[in-house]
Amino acid sequence: MKIVVDENMPHALELFAEFGEVIPLPGRQMQAVDLQDADVLLVRSVTRVDAELLATSPRLRFVGTATIGTDHVDKALLAVRNIPFFSAPGCNKYSVGDYVLSTLLVLAERHELNLREMSLAVIGAGNTGECVACKAEALGMRVLRCDPPRARVAGQAGETDAFVDYQTALGADIVSFHVPITREGPDATFHLLDEQVIAARPAGQILVNASRGEVWDNQALLARQQGLEPLRLVMDVWEGEPEPLRALVPHTEIATPHIAGYSLEGKARGTWMLYQALCQQLGRAARQDLQSLLPAPEVRALTPGQPVDQALIKQLVHLIYDVRRDDARFRNRIELPGSFDEQRKHYPERRELSSLHVNGPFASDTLARLGFTVQPG
């Protein structure tokens, strides 16, 4: 069996070698000729799986993406060809949640904000959006959930208060986007934040995009940011990746190269979920578990000496992941050719909050809800 994988997919060799020959290739440069003898194709979001890529792949019998989103895959084509398709829903939801939490704490310190007194709207309340919402609620924030497809289902079940509409959500102090990219239909998300919506936003409103770059109109944002009443932007994703609108970067609070979901656990979990799926597809028992893939964290345990407040939460979160390091690296290298993908390929080791065990009398439920492993007493 020949297994073609994105070369940046972690642990692919050790997980899939038991099935046959593993052939790692650059994700953005995969071509049809690479798949002529392939039985399995494993990709990330940078590879478009379409008729052109699959033009000469008669042996292909399994396609998987180690990502939450699937907009880069022509699922209808795979269905017509009877090729099973698997994704990794929720694989990096904790990583993205940690990213948003880290950015909120940076902005709170920078602009002297009390997050408990603020509201946050999550646009897209799926696996990732709900993780962000739960962390925000743990901070004491008022959280609004906007998800039209889920709202319709909830409405049919008589649950009318679980979701708000888009306009209501846009009224929150902070609006965080966690939607797939769709261009058609009543719930299309392409340029969901368009020129008109951008123009109507109050000065200083915090907007976060850790979903897909095309969800925001980047040119319209640049025009707004160059005016007298700019917004506070947190951008992990960009239109035109891997060539973002460089002129927009200086006008952001936090700017990073699509790495919100890049924790060690998140990346390993995505590959491992595909490993499980292939085992199931072939009728084989999984021989490896997720934890065996992960190294011991640098910081394993800590005992706070004070009650939990926003300052302590910031210290603990940034001990594990401080988004400012990624922001500084991105800004320093933005002008270098190919730096966007290079930073993703060689992203430094980063753990999720769950890797830190918080012990002692101040190991509260709040810290557990934020994602830390808590051992009170």
UniProtKB/Swiss-Prot annotation:
The active site is at residues 212, 241, 258. Its main location: cytoplasm. Disulfide bonds: none annotated. Homodimer. Its EC number is 1.1.1.290. Substrate binds at residues 45, 67, 262. Keywords: Cytoplasm, NAD, Oxidoreductase, Pyridoxine biosynthesis. Belongs to the D-isomer specific 2-hydroxyacid dehydrogenase family. PdxB subfamily. This is Erythronate-4-phosphate dehydrogenase. It catalyses: 4-phospho-D-erythronate + NAD(+) = (R)-3-hydroxy-2-oxo-4-phosphooxybutanoate + NADH + H(+). GO terms for molecular function: 4-phosphoerythronate dehydrogenase activity; NAD binding; protein dimerization activity. NAD(+) binds at residues 147, 210-212, 236, 261. Pfam families: 2-Hacid_dh (PF00389), 2-Hacid_dh_C (PF02826), DUF3410 (PF11890). InterPro entries: D-isomer_2_OHA_DH_cat_dom, D-isomer_DH_NAD-bd, Erythronate-4-P_DHase, Erythronate-4-P_DHase_dimer, NAD(P)-bd_dom_sf, PdxB_dimer_sf. Transmembrane segments: none annotated. It comes from Aeromonas salmonicida (strain A449). Pathway: Cofactor biosynthesis; pyridoxine 5'-phosphate biosynthesis; pyridoxine 5'-phosphate from D-erythrose 4-phosphate: step 2/5.
